[in-house]
Regions:
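N-terminal "arm"/small-domain region of PLP-dependent enzymes with the aminotransferase-like
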Residues: 1-62, 291
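PLP-dependent aminotransferase-like
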Residues: 21-25, 103-203
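PLP-dependent aminotransferase class I/II
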Residues: 27, 69-73, 81-84, 153, ...
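Glycine-/small-residue-rich active-site loops that bind phosphorylated ligands and cofactors
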Residues: 45, 63, 123, 146-147, ...
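Phosphate-binding glycine-rich loop
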Residues: 66-116, 129-134, 140, 207
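Structural detector of well-ordered beta-strand residues that form the stable sheet scaffold
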Residues: 85, 118, 139, 192-193, ...
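Conserved active-site segment immediately N-terminal to the catalytic lysine
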Residues: 194-232, 247, 287-289
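Active-site PLP attachment segment
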Residues: 215-260, 301
């Protein structure tokens, strides 16, 4: 087949065939029929992603490469930040973001074991897990309903002389009160990590400027797992405007190396063999000098290739998510006597990840969810509900050590008991949204 072709000609033919294959076997989806299962999330893609994936595979560059560089550059440009590091998951991104704040390079602002980090228990566990894994103490504050984000009025009662940071997620795409939280962090000289994994594309107006979430704090994180706003299968990102934090993030991501050379590169600094570090002998190969205890958290170039194609489509994804959320909220008008419908935080433009619903008194969440599921609509809890109630906290609860609660978690407990959510992903049609709203209204009868 390729006997008379150059390598480039063969490659172009393979990619053209890949495009045809995708258009024939992947993109001929059956239209939604009433009664079909409606998932809360799904990947949305076309031939562009598959062509990029095959293009990368043909190079057989199995680690990070040209697509990784392209993605990091274009993603940083989209966000309006200077530095972006691609990683293998959103959970790794959160781990890396927090881990960066434990670096001795931060001097008196370094987070040490026993230092406190303010967060919430109503969310996903990997926002909190790095805090515990590094020996710091999460301090849990309650959230507000129907925004499902931290109540900033409770921050002052949570702070202590041990507090070093605030680490919060923008719940299902709804930005938390960034002005209040950022002012609080500035007032107390605290780090702010924005877990932006469920909120890519959301905006918040601060000091008269509309900015993307994840870029207002010191470090932001994203996830590219298939249900998220865009995907590369597995994958995540850490981003910042701070050059020192970027240097630390790259070190921790790449085994803890002091060297900035990418795999396969050598001696970019020109001083590979002529400097002395720690108590190593003069001239020890800088490629193998370690300034941190790090990991290998990089993604592959094949994942990045998919991400590059997704990123070009991303604005349309956000537009559709906003449409779907607004359509669903309009369709559920008249249910407010039984359900609390979600509301955007003030000064925000959410890129919604899901549609959160809290049952009012007299409506049993579990029974309602079961009826909705029986009608083919997939539902989800607000992740952990109240993380403190989970088995991973059993030992800490028993000893009363390892975490602290500031005030009550009344709304957090209510979310655990009464809240669920349904999807608004960009592949949903208006017919699917109508069916979801009908299923909920019928289940309430």
């Amino acid at each position: 087949m390729f006997e008379e072709m150059t390598e480039q000609q063969a490659r172009e033919q393979i990619l053209e065939m890949t495009k045809e294959y995708c258009e024939k076997y992947h993109n001929q989806k059956k239209p939604y029929k009433k009664g079909d299962r409606i998932p809360y999330a799904s990947r949305v893609y076309d031939a562009d992603e598959m062509v990029n994936l095959v293009d990368s595979s043909l190079e057989f560059w199995l680690t990070s490469g040209r697509f990784t560089k392209e993605f990091e550059s274009e993603f940083a440009k989209y966000l309006g930040v200077k530095y972006c590091s691609l990683v293998n998951s959103g959970s790794s991104a959160n781990l890396l973001a927090f881990m960066a704040l434990t670096s001795p390079l931060l001097k008196e602002r370094q987070i040490l074991p026993g230092d406190e980090v303010i967060t919430v228990a109503a969310g996903f566990p990997t926002t909190v897990a790095p805090v515990i894994q590094y020996g710091a103490v999460p301090v849990f504050v309650d959230v507000a309903i129907p925004q499902y984000n931290i109540d900033p009025n409770l921050l002052e009662q949570a702070v202590s002389e041990k507090t070093k940071a605030v680490m919060l997620a923008h719940t299902l795409g709804n930005p938390f009160d960034l002005k209040a939280v950022k002012d609080f962090c500035d007032r107390h000289n605290l780090w702010l990590i924005e877990d932006n994994c469920d909120a890519l594309g959301s905006r918040y107006t601060i000091d008269g400027e509309s900015r993307l979430t994840g870029t207002i704090g010191d470090i932001g994180t994203s996830s590219f797992y298939p249900p998220h706003h865009m995907t590369m299968g597995e994958g995540g990102a850490v981003y910042t405007k701070n050059p020192l934090l970027h240097k630390i993030v790259r070190s921790f991501r790449d085994w803890g190396r002091d060297c900035v050379c990418a795999p396969g590169q050598d001696n970019l600094c020109g001083h590979r063999f002529d400097r002395q570090y720690g108590e190593l002998p003069l001239g020890y190969d800088h490629k193998y000098v370690y300034s941190h205890f790090g990991y290998n958290l990089k993604a592959t170039d094949m994942q990045a290739a998919v991400g590059c194609a997704q990123l070009r489509k991303f604005p349309s994804f956000v537009e559709r998510r906003i449409h779907n959320f607004n359509y669903l909220k309009e369709a559920l008008k008249g249910t407010e006597d039984k359900l609390i419908l979600p509301e955007a935080c003030e000064n925000s433009e959410p890129s919604w990840f899901g549609f959160l619903i809290t049952c009012r008194e007299g409506v049993d969440r579990n029974q309602l969810v079961q009826k909705i599921e029986e009608k083919g609509v997939q539902t989800r809890m607000l992740f952990a509900g109240n993380l403190i109630k989970h088995p991973c906290f059993d030992q800490m609860r028993a000893t009363g050590k390892g975490y602290r609660v500031a005030g009550s978690l009344e709304n957090t407990d209510r979310i655990m008991m009464d809240t669920f959510w349904i999807g608004v992903y960009p592949g949903m049609t208006d017919a699917m949204l109508d069916a979801m709203a009908d299923a909920i209204k019928e289940a309430l009868e």
